[in-house]
Curated annotation (Swiss-Prot):
Protein name, as recorded: Peptide methionine sulfoxide reductase MsrA
Similarity comment text for this entry: Belongs to the MsrA Met sulfoxide reductase family.
Protein role: Has an important function as a repair enzyme for proteins that have been inactivated by oxidation. Catalyzes the reversible oxidation-reduction of methionine sulfoxide in proteins to methionine.
Domain of life where this protein originates: Bacteria
Protein EC: 1.8.4.11
Keyword Oxidoreductase: yes
Amino acid sequence: MERAIFAGGCFWCMVQPFEEQAGILSVRSGYTGGHVPNPSYEQVCSKTTGHTEAVEIIFDPSLISYSDLVELYWAQTDPTDAFGQFEDRGDNYRPVIYYTDERQREIAERSKQTLQASGRFDQPIVTSIKPAEPFYLAEDYHQGFYQKNPERYAQSSAIRHQFLEEHWQ
């Protein structure tokens, strides 16, 4: 099994696309990239901990590749916006691919270069690619949010879905 960590704005919106893929064992919402151990949601939202909301994905590489996960990640985000994603603004919503080893870094960097060269976007691709840092699980009520709160999830992800339809489909 392997692990992937992606930050792409609100973690509620990053779970379902990965959970729907064959070879995914778990997708958990949490926080990473900051300087406070085991932060709470309230602390992260205060924008004082340095963390970003992210998802940790455990996957079977014999069924789905890390490269496939990176491609799916791009299609869930606006890679030209370094200051948040869609209606979620601020450093705690910044887009980051966190790599766990050198192979993942190379795959992510190559994929980013390919996306930039594709001409899909007029603006530069600004998503960061950084080494993985400690990943802290978010509170239980954030886990599987789209399943527990489908109406609130649909409302919170509407702007994202509109962008994805316009740019990725």
